[in-house]
Amino acid sequence: MSVIKKDQTREQYDRSKIQGGILRACYKRPIPVEKIESLMDSIEGDIFDTADKEISSTRIGEIVMEHLKDLDAVAYVRFASVYR
């Protein structure tokens, strides 16, 4: 799957980029690693369910924020402040 970036360039989907953003947002929060892994799996499932061959980085960010909002308010705000 390809990700369409804001400058319209394309690159291969990379789970580690999303995971890095989530880990930074959850830094020093009382969230077990298992919960973060489960969150990643859910996010990835949504990404692959909503897109065929391409998805915009903006849409990926929206999906991540939807999931983080339910997990932890502080992590959500951290991610949103960097993402926007």
What residues fall within each predicted segment?
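C-terminal binding/interaction regions
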Residues: 81
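Extended interfacial segments that mediate partner engagement and assembly in macromolecular machines
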Residues: 1-78
